[in-house]
Amino acid sequence: MPPKSTTTKHIFVTGGVASSLGKGLTASSLGMLLKARGLRVVMQKLDPYLNVDPGTMNPFQHGEVFVTNDGAETDLDIGHYERFLDRDLDGSANVTTGQVYSTVIAKERRGEYLGDTVQVIPHITNEIKHRIRRMATDEVDVVITEVGGTVGDIESLPFLETVRQVRHEVGRDNVFVVHISLLPYIGPSGELKTKPTQHSVAALRNIGIQPDAIVLRCDREVPTAIKRKISLMCDVDEAAVVACPDARSIYDIPKTVHGEGLDAYVVRKLDLPFRDVDWTTWDDLLDRVHKPDHEINLALVGKYIDLPDAYLSVTEALRAGGFANRARVKIKWVTSDDCKTPAGAAGQLGDVDAICIPGGFGDRGVSGKVGAIQYAREHRIPLLGLCLGLQCIVIEAARNLADIPDANSTEFDSATGHPVISTMAEQLDIVAGEGDMGGTMRLGMYPAKLAEGSIVREVYDGKEYVEERHRHRYEVNNAYRAELEKKAGLQFSGTSPDGKLVEYVEYPREVHPYLVATQAHPELRSRPTRPHPLFAGLVKAAVERKTGK
């Protein structure tokens, strides 16, 4: 057998015909398969929007912001990459047009281009190229780079031109391009139509890129004759035309991709050393996904529920918590405003087994979150609060148990007489409008110390110190901690190691079986194969409540 190449390989994933085809999930599935074949894989997303990062974007437009360990605010696809690869990525995994142009303009202002006329080619493409190539370290066998947007978009052109240049510079044998296209079904004629894919590939060729494989997204099985036609008309091997119909679960996609032979085709074309796919961990996951022993109804009480992608990592973490308990988690999406009154909360939450209060910003919907927390506390329904969810638990305890009826957060009422939640000291200028909003929160991984005998210490398997990712500007006001503990019985069960910042709160188990919250975003570190303990604990409490154990 000839020796295999030791050069880091690049796989680029592009999309055609329509957006939201699942490029990120397909790329993640391919990455998972290559990792399961013994290869070292990292992933990256190129986003063509002009924002520097998604940190200031409307959740209704963009979905969630995924925060990495190093505090970068990134695209939600980075979350898919981490969950499928079971690998922590950093800020370099997300490149935006805004970042690229900001860097190039800053270099021009410093005179680094020595008087050159700064242009898209070569200056912008060189900067993109640098950000792609720096992923290819000695510890990496394969870099998978997803190109955001759709072939034909004006915004994507510099990225696609860069892909062409990378292929030219590192060698065609070291680069593989996967093009994902929609294969629409026309009901009246009963036909799958190949023409949109042909036109999409033609547009890609016009830029100078010939795809090596085509993934067909469709809602049904694809006949061999259709694959042969696309192979002929798009000039790819028939073995490289891959059908990827809609799956019951996103975690079924790797099996589909493998069944079509894409991963085997890729490793052979790129001359990569490989072994057979090790399915041990993934098969156990799929068994838990499709053969649950229990089913629970869980209410996710939020303000952005019209776009579920705004809570993507939360919903995946909740489902993973179900996998840990062999339970199917059926999510009931509840608009927080519907829980403002006791009657509204009872109507929305009376039939659920657990509740999750996720993060958010601004005062809209907060009174409903507080109402949902009160209902959960009074009816002993397991509840997990995340970020703003913790702050709302503190506000509810202050108002209803500690006799501070006007307790509030300075985020919602800057003139409140009882700011039980207040602005972090280093955030005062930003909140006052004297600093940039983007990239200035408390971001990234921070440690916490858990109290002995607490519920959170128990669910974290007895660990005294844990680390979680954060994204917030406000904190529990320490001036009220003693009063809340004494009057409301709320326990501050986890703090920063110096004791100054509240990181976890809970009620004692004899008061409530599982009313727990964290100032962090633990959903960002959950994996389908390694569920996060806080979510697993929530589902466990819900199963016990439902089964009476």
From Swiss-Prot:
Catalytic residue positions: C387 (nucleophile), H521, E523
Annotated coiled-coil segments of the chain: none
Entries under Gene3D superfamilies matching the protein: 3.40.50.880, P-loop containing nucleotide triphosphate hydrolases (3.40.50.300)
Molecular function per GO: ATP binding; CTP synthase activity; glutaminase activity; identical protein binding; metal ion binding
Keywords carried by this UniProt record: ATP-binding, Glutamine amidotransferase, Ligase, Magnesium, Metal-binding, Nucleotide-binding, Pyrimidine biosynthesis
UniProt note on regulation of activity: Allosterically activated by GTP, when glutamine is the substrate; GTP has no effect on the reaction when ammonia is the substrate. The allosteric effector GTP functions by stabilizing the protein conformation that binds the tetrahedral intermediate(s) formed during glutamine hydrolysis. Inhibited by the product CTP, via allosteric rather than competitive inhibition.
Reactions accelerated catalytically: UTP + L-glutamine + ATP + H2O = CTP + L-glutamate + ADP + phosphate + 2 H(+); L-glutamine + H2O = L-glutamate + NH4(+); UTP + NH4(+) + ATP = CTP + ADP + phosphate + 2 H(+)
UniProt KW Nucleotide-binding keyword: yes
BP GO annotations: 'de novo' CTP biosynthetic process; pyrimidine nucleobase biosynthetic process
InterPro entries per record: Class_I_gatase-like, CTP_synthase, CTP_synthase_N, GATASE, GATase1_CTP_Synthase, P-loop_NTPase
Annotated stretches, region: Amidoligase domain: 1-272
Domain Glutamine amidotransferase type-1: 297-548
Chain positions recorded as UTP binding sites: S19, K193, T194, K195, P196, T197, Q198, K229
Pathway(s) it belongs to: Pyrimidine metabolism; CTP biosynthesis via de novo pathway; CTP from UDP: step 2/2
PROSITE patterns: GATASE_TYPE_1
Residues that, per the record, bind Mg(2+): D77, E146
Positions with a binding annotation for ATP: S20, L21, G22, K23, G24, L25, D77
A cellular component annotation (GO) from this entry: cytosol
E.C. number(s) listed in UniProt: 6.3.4.2
Binding-site list for CTP: S19, D153, I154, E155, K193, T194, K195, P196, T197, Q198, K229
SUBUNIT field: Homotetramer.
NCBIfam families: PRK05380.1, PyrG
Function statement: Catalyzes the ATP-dependent amination of UTP to CTP with either L-glutamine or ammonia as the source of nitrogen. Regulates intracellular CTP levels through interactions with the four ribonucleotide triphosphates.
Further remark: CTPSs have evolved a hybrid strategy for distinguishing between UTP and CTP. The overlapping regions of the product feedback inhibitory and substrate sites recognize a common feature in both compounds, the triphosphate moiety. To differentiate isosteric substrate and product pyrimidine rings, an additional pocket far from the expected kinase/ligase catalytic site, specifically recognizes the cytosine and ribose portions of the product inhibitor.
HAMAP family, per the entry: PyrG (MF_01227)
UniProt name for this protein: CTP synthase
Originating organism: Streptomyces avermitilis (strain ATCC 31267 / DSM 46492 / JCM 5070 / NBRC 14893 / NCIMB 12804 / NRRL 8165 / MA-4680)
